[in-house]
Amino acid sequence: MSNPQSGTIGCHCGICEITVADKRAVQYFRCGCEDCRQGIEWGSSRKITKPNICTVKPDQLPHVYYIPADIISIKGKEFMSAYKLREDGRSIRLYCKQCWSLIAVEHPAYQSNVFYILPKHCVTSCDLSVPLTAILFMKDYPEDYETPPEDDVPLFYSFEYKQERQRFSSLPTVANTFKRRTDPLKGINFTELVNSLGEPEILNLERGKRFL
Protein backbone atom coordinates (compact mmCIF):
# COMPACT_ATOMS: atom_id res chain seq x y z
CA MET A 1 0.00 0.00 0.00
CA SER A 2 1.31 3.47 -0.85
CA ASN A 3 2.24 5.89 1.90
CA PRO A 4 -0.69 8.09 2.95
CA GLN A 5 -0.73 11.67 1.72
CA SER A 6 -2.02 14.52 3.84
CA GLY A 7 -5.20 16.42 2.99
CA THR A 8 -6.98 19.54 4.15
CA ILE A 9 -10.51 20.29 5.35
CA GLY A 10 -11.48 23.91 5.82
CA CYS A 11 -14.17 26.54 5.60
CA HIS A 12 -15.42 28.49 2.61
CA CYS A 13 -13.92 31.79 3.77
CA GLY A 14 -10.47 30.23 4.19
CA ILE A 15 -9.86 31.30 7.77
CA CYS A 16 -10.17 27.81 9.32
CA GLU A 17 -8.47 24.62 8.18
CA ILE A 18 -7.30 21.31 9.56
CA THR A 19 -4.75 19.06 7.89
CA VAL A 20 -5.08 15.30 8.29
CA ALA A 21 -2.23 12.81 7.93
CA ASP A 22 -4.20 10.54 5.59
CA LYS A 23 -6.51 12.20 3.08
CA ARG A 24 -8.27 9.00 1.99
CA ALA A 25 -11.90 8.71 3.05
CA VAL A 26 -12.56 5.24 4.48
CA GLN A 27 -16.37 5.19 4.39
CA TYR A 28 -19.18 6.88 2.46
CA PHE A 29 -22.84 6.98 3.41
CA ARG A 30 -25.83 9.02 2.35
CA CYS A 31 -27.86 9.97 5.39
CA GLY A 32 -31.50 10.93 5.80
CA CYS A 33 -31.38 11.61 9.55
CA GLU A 34 -32.86 14.74 11.08
CA ASP A 35 -29.61 15.63 12.85
CA CYS A 36 -27.60 15.79 9.62
CA ARG A 37 -30.32 17.87 8.00
CA GLN A 38 -30.72 20.30 10.91
CA GLY A 39 -26.96 20.70 11.39
CA ILE A 40 -26.55 21.63 7.73
CA GLU A 41 -29.62 23.88 7.59
CA TRP A 42 -28.75 25.72 10.80
CA GLY A 43 -25.27 26.60 9.51
CA SER A 44 -26.63 27.56 6.10
CA SER A 45 -29.28 29.78 7.70
CA ARG A 46 -26.55 31.71 9.52
CA LYS A 47 -24.84 32.36 6.18
CA ILE A 48 -28.00 33.89 4.76
CA THR A 49 -27.72 36.71 7.32
CA LYS A 50 -24.31 37.61 5.83
CA PRO A 51 -24.77 38.58 2.16
CA ASN A 52 -21.04 38.52 1.40
CA ILE A 53 -20.78 34.80 2.21
CA CYS A 54 -21.45 32.26 -0.52
CA THR A 55 -24.27 29.85 0.35
CA VAL A 56 -24.80 26.40 -1.12
CA LYS A 57 -28.12 24.60 -1.38
CA PRO A 58 -28.07 21.54 0.90
CA ASP A 59 -28.58 18.12 -0.67
CA GLN A 60 -31.81 16.43 0.35
CA LEU A 61 -29.83 13.28 1.14
CA PRO A 62 -26.39 14.47 2.32
CA HIS A 63 -23.15 12.81 1.24
CA VAL A 64 -21.23 11.76 4.37
CA TYR A 65 -17.54 10.83 4.15
CA TYR A 66 -15.47 9.45 7.03
CA ILE A 67 -11.85 10.57 7.37
CA PRO A 68 -9.16 9.02 9.63
CA ALA A 69 -8.92 11.23 12.72
CA ASP A 70 -5.22 12.12 12.74
CA ILE A 71 -4.87 15.92 12.60
CA ILE A 72 -1.33 17.18 12.02
CA SER A 73 -1.98 20.92 11.83
CA ILE A 74 -4.72 23.43 12.63
CA LYS A 75 -5.24 26.91 11.19
CA GLY A 76 -7.66 29.47 12.58
CA LYS A 77 -8.55 27.53 15.71
CA GLU A 78 -9.71 30.74 17.38
CA PHE A 79 -12.44 31.01 14.72
CA MET A 80 -13.72 27.46 15.29
CA SER A 81 -16.60 26.62 17.58
CA ALA A 82 -18.21 23.33 18.64
CA TYR A 83 -21.96 22.78 18.95
CA LYS A 84 -24.50 20.15 19.92
CA LEU A 85 -27.95 20.36 18.41
CA ARG A 86 -29.67 19.49 21.70
CA GLU A 87 -28.83 18.82 25.34
CA ASP A 88 -29.16 15.06 24.81
CA GLY A 89 -27.22 15.12 21.54
CA ARG A 90 -24.13 12.98 21.17
CA SER A 91 -22.65 14.33 17.93
CA ILE A 92 -20.43 17.41 18.11
CA ARG A 93 -20.29 19.69 15.06
CA LEU A 94 -17.36 21.97 14.31
CA TYR A 95 -18.22 25.21 12.50
CA CYS A 96 -16.28 28.25 11.34
CA LYS A 97 -17.72 31.24 13.22
CA GLN A 98 -16.96 33.59 10.33
CA CYS A 99 -18.68 31.83 7.41
CA TRP A 100 -20.57 29.03 9.22
CA SER A 101 -19.10 26.27 7.11
CA LEU A 102 -19.61 22.89 8.78
CA ILE A 103 -16.03 21.65 8.96
CA ALA A 104 -16.51 18.22 10.55
CA VAL A 105 -18.63 16.09 12.89
CA GLU A 106 -17.79 13.45 15.48
CA HIS A 107 -19.77 10.99 17.59
CA PRO A 108 -18.70 8.79 20.55
CA ALA A 109 -19.48 5.66 18.49
CA TYR A 110 -16.55 6.54 16.21
CA GLN A 111 -14.15 5.96 19.16
CA SER A 112 -11.96 8.88 17.99
CA ASN A 113 -10.86 6.77 15.01
CA VAL A 114 -12.70 8.82 12.37
CA PHE A 115 -14.84 11.91 11.95
CA TYR A 116 -17.10 12.78 9.07
CA ILE A 117 -17.28 15.64 6.62
CA LEU A 118 -20.00 16.89 4.29
CA PRO A 119 -17.95 18.07 1.30
CA LYS A 120 -20.63 20.41 0.00
CA HIS A 121 -20.42 22.39 3.24
CA CYS A 122 -16.65 22.63 3.62
CA VAL A 123 -13.60 22.86 1.34
CA THR A 124 -11.46 19.74 1.15
CA SER A 125 -8.57 18.22 -0.77
CA CYS A 126 -9.28 14.76 0.66
CA ASP A 127 -9.67 11.75 -1.62
CA LEU A 128 -13.40 10.96 -1.70
CA SER A 129 -13.24 8.15 -4.25
CA VAL A 130 -14.42 5.49 -1.76
CA PRO A 131 -17.62 3.78 -3.03
CA LEU A 132 -21.00 4.31 -1.39
CA THR A 133 -21.56 1.80 1.44
CA ALA A 134 -25.18 2.37 2.45
CA ILE A 135 -28.09 4.80 2.76
CA LEU A 136 -29.02 5.47 6.39
CA PHE A 137 -31.89 6.70 8.60
CA MET A 138 -34.58 6.97 5.97
CA LYS A 139 -37.12 7.05 8.81
CA ASP A 140 -36.44 10.81 9.03
CA TYR A 141 -36.50 11.53 5.28
CA PRO A 142 -39.19 14.22 4.72
CA GLU A 143 -42.23 13.24 2.68
CA ASP A 144 -41.99 16.41 0.57
CA TYR A 145 -38.48 15.54 -0.64
CA GLU A 146 -37.70 13.86 -3.94
CA THR A 147 -37.72 10.08 -4.30
CA PRO A 148 -34.45 8.84 -2.76
CA PRO A 149 -31.74 7.49 -5.06
CA GLU A 150 -31.93 3.85 -6.09
CA ASP A 151 -28.25 2.97 -5.65
CA ASP A 152 -27.64 -0.77 -5.37
CA VAL A 153 -26.50 -0.57 -1.73
CA PRO A 154 -28.11 -1.54 1.58
CA LEU A 155 -30.73 0.92 2.84
CA PHE A 156 -31.52 1.26 6.55
CA TYR A 157 -34.79 2.73 7.78
CA SER A 158 -33.51 3.11 11.34
CA PHE A 159 -31.31 1.36 13.90
CA GLU A 160 -34.20 0.86 16.30
CA TYR A 161 -34.18 -2.92 15.98
CA LYS A 162 -31.38 -5.33 16.80
CA GLN A 163 -31.61 -6.98 13.39
CA GLU A 164 -30.94 -3.67 11.63
CA ARG A 165 -27.96 -2.92 13.86
CA GLN A 166 -26.52 -6.37 13.26
CA ARG A 167 -27.03 -6.07 9.51
CA PHE A 168 -25.23 -2.72 9.56
CA SER A 169 -22.33 -4.03 11.66
CA SER A 170 -21.90 -6.95 9.26
CA LEU A 171 -21.05 -4.66 6.33
CA PRO A 172 -17.37 -5.30 5.49
CA THR A 173 -16.04 -1.75 5.97
CA VAL A 174 -18.17 -0.73 8.95
CA ALA A 175 -16.39 -2.69 11.69
CA ASN A 176 -13.01 -1.35 10.57
CA THR A 177 -14.17 2.25 10.42
CA PHE A 178 -15.76 2.45 13.86
CA LYS A 179 -13.12 0.72 15.95
CA ARG A 180 -10.59 2.14 18.37
CA ARG A 181 -7.34 3.15 16.68
CA THR A 182 -4.28 1.04 17.47
CA ASP A 183 -1.66 2.70 15.24
CA PRO A 184 0.16 5.71 16.74
CA LEU A 185 -1.05 9.15 15.70
CA LYS A 186 1.16 11.63 13.89
CA GLY A 187 -0.82 14.48 15.42
CA ILE A 188 -3.99 14.62 17.53
CA ASN A 189 -7.41 13.06 17.06
CA PHE A 190 -10.57 15.05 16.44
CA THR A 191 -11.80 14.50 20.00
CA GLU A 192 -8.71 16.29 21.33
CA LEU A 193 -9.31 19.23 19.00
CA VAL A 194 -12.95 19.55 20.07
CA ASN A 195 -12.08 19.23 23.77
CA SER A 196 -9.49 22.00 23.44
CA LEU A 197 -12.27 24.40 22.37
CA GLY A 198 -14.15 24.00 25.65
CA GLU A 199 -17.68 22.76 26.25
CA PRO A 200 -19.76 22.69 23.06
CA GLU A 201 -22.60 25.20 22.87
CA ILE A 202 -26.06 23.62 23.08
CA LEU A 203 -28.33 24.96 20.33
CA ASN A 204 -31.57 23.40 21.64
CA LEU A 205 -32.98 23.07 18.13
CA GLU A 206 -36.62 22.05 18.01
CA ARG A 207 -37.10 18.57 16.60
CA GLY A 208 -38.83 18.61 13.25
CA LYS A 209 -38.06 22.27 12.61
CA ARG A 210 -36.75 23.28 9.20
CA PHE A 211 -34.32 26.18 8.90
CA LEU A 212 -34.37 26.73 5.14
Name each model feature, range by range.
Residues 2-9, 16-212:
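A short Gly-Trp-Pro
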